[in-house]
Amino acid sequence: MAQSFFELIKRIQALAEIGLHYSTSTYDTERYEEIQEISLKILNQLTDIPVEKIKPVIEENNGYKTPKVDIRAVVFNGEGKILLIQEKVDRCWALPGGWADVGYSPKMVAEKECFEEAGLKVKASHLLAVMDKTAQKMPPQFEYVYKLFIRCEPSGTNISTGSETLDVGWFGENEIPELSLPRNLKSHIHMMFEYDRGERNSVYLD
């Protein structure tokens, strides 16, 4: 129920932002701003995060609200083990990746994140999955997020930590450490192993 309520509030926020973007009436603008302020206060009560911290996130992309894109690199070492990085922020593990960057293609982001987080040069090859974070029942956050999982081929197997990672490693399917759930679920990792074994061929799409 909490996640459902959270998503409804985010939808209200998005509609208010779209209204502000297109409104030509002072009256309508004031009403959309009031709706925005009310939804911020509800988010504050739901999350216990102060309004002054929520507001900059909401206002970051004022205008027609669209989903943010999170890109994850899927790398195997040729021995059936997948590359994971340990995040400094929560000390849990995830596929290398992060937000899509303006000026970078999805392939470029996957390659860049692998090198920055795991010290590994890779060549992005093809898309494996496109997931809707809400549909996947992942922990809620302010942004509405799509996740792209991109298969990458490594130039080697030597890996090293980056500025945002505590550790990096290659893991078998039965060796998966505690995962950073806002970034990936265990079901996502198992799906990537299915692709590696050839048990899945078509792109997964939410």
Describe the function of each predicted region.
Residues 1-32, 38, 92, 163-206:
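Nudix hydrolase/Nudix homology domain
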Residues 96-98:
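Extended, positively charged loop/linker patches that create polyanion-binding surfaces
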